[in-house]
């Protein structure tokens, strides 16, 4: 059988890069076999506290960047900046960042996390960093380790922000706009030491250990190689110059280790403050254990998905935490941002998906808190807009409100938001009457589709939102509204489909980003089936759009900007559609392509990475909150999903890697629109046993159990009764407790897994790299094709 790498990673060439610009590539040796794979060449990570107003960026090198400065590390004597690209998370998913830097026989193991001293997110955030130094050699050795603070790192682009860092400070005009704590650079700052701390203009920047005693110097070098002078003074250094250096020269016997602990207040503090005293006396292990307990306790409240691939499990867990760290509590407001870095802002489009993820993950109170902030973005005319021209916000809010009710059955919430729903629908009705196409008005979103005109996706969103407005009207007994909204929906949908039919007549069925413009980026035109089903999943327009967008993939994921950049989470619009359509193999292949493009800390990105190039997202930093929410929902929907509040679907998509004798899949505490779903699947050499323990508050019409495409099924029974199989699925009674499935794997079943996908990616990258070394080219048609 022909190798399927072409489907996973190599697609027809679709990268319209200026032919005069030679592509850049990295030496494949960047990836070490003894380290977990990390796709990004310049990964950024976060340590932070749920609901705090700011977070700390763990830089590609392993430094700690805040709005006020960057603590960096050095090894050797003279000191050389430490650089360690690959990092991991404690237990694989907790927001405790770990990495090991090896210098000859000395290992420097760095562990970092953030906490507030009193456990309240509104309090000052403190960063704890432990460096454990180990001599792995067979003879004594001296370890040289140093720390120092700088304002920022080097920049190789326009602007003052360092490479792979975020802009700071930033003061928003209104809550929800981009904000960053911090200060502007000031060359007149004074620097000095006070016992165990570096002071900048009289504020503590970081605390360092005094035992063993360090060598202190205000700068790494002296202009005349003189004796260091450590009296407090102005240094007039550059923003990139490290200051406040402490160096430790430690003799270690074979197998011996030494621990150093550093503490970094996210906001500099007065040296005589009670917070500094508390930070100095705080026991790192106590706060580490509190951090572990907090997140473990939160995780055990929600959905738990376990499959026989650790990368899948850890990515699922870690990305819930990434979104919770991205949330701010400001007064009584809970502001869901996208990350604590360059996207430290509120967007209706991102937040609506993140809220849906919280609801579907078993955190309705967290979802409700975030939803309460949406109301402030309703305009006087009734529309919902968080960024100018982005009218998809109307449908996203209606959908977010409706889905929250549908999964929680919270009537108090429905009553609270319904007046704003009425105003919103009134706006839609008037907007359609005034529009020449009787659709969502022409607009310039300035993002996503990047068109000016009637945006296809805005209409899919509006229809999906209107469906949820109808549901809210019905449950609240607003029958007159429900009838009027249904009539509006029917007319709107018919008008929209007629326009789609007209437009797609000349595009082989492909639904373009704009209905009355020829340019634009694929985005909302990929939403015909999910998150609300507007068109039949098998509609020819859905199929054509799916095929047309998949033809634009590079490295197995979607592209953006006419093929110039990879786009990570945009891919999942197709993955969700494939899951619903029953395109199981495509969905599994995309699952692994998505995972390949994460860091070793399971962070996703947005775009800006060039295909088959440097794997550098530049200033478009990870982790990305919309990726986080969409990945969790994509995996959840593969295993458990609703269809139109009527059917419950189980195991829509599973990987061949999971179907091994003795292995299993477990889904626990999964909220659905029907109630809580719990099941375990155990695989044998000739089939599977499924045990269910569901608690329905509203029974589904039936349960659809999907069967893998890579097996031949010989029989299915539910609670001892034979069940017919049709279209690779079995309809189960809603009270089913035990399902027995007999099958045999088909000959030549594909070997799909995360490890295989990484291996295939690395092999293809090396192949292109070797050609690039010889010819300077890695982007011609000879290297593409299906």
Whereabouts are the PLM-identified features?
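Bacterial N-terminal signal peptides that target proteins for export
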Residues: 1-9
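Bacterial N-terminal signal peptides
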Residues: 8-17
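Terminal accessory carbohydrate-recognition/targeting modules of carbohydrate-active enzymes
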Residues: 22-307, 644-786
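Aromatic-rich carbohydrate-recognition surfaces in CAZymes
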Residues: 135, 174-182, 187, 191, ...
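Active-site acid/base region of carbohydrate-active enzymes
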Residues: 198-223, 299-325, 348-349, 379, ...
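The feature captures the catalytic groove of carbohydrate-active enzymes
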Residues: 230-232, 239-284, 339-340, 383-392, ...
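An acidic-aromatic substrate-binding cleft motif
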Residues: 281-341
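Active-site core of glycosidic bond-cleaving carbohydrate-active enzymes
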Residues: 341-363, 370-380, 415, 419-422, ...
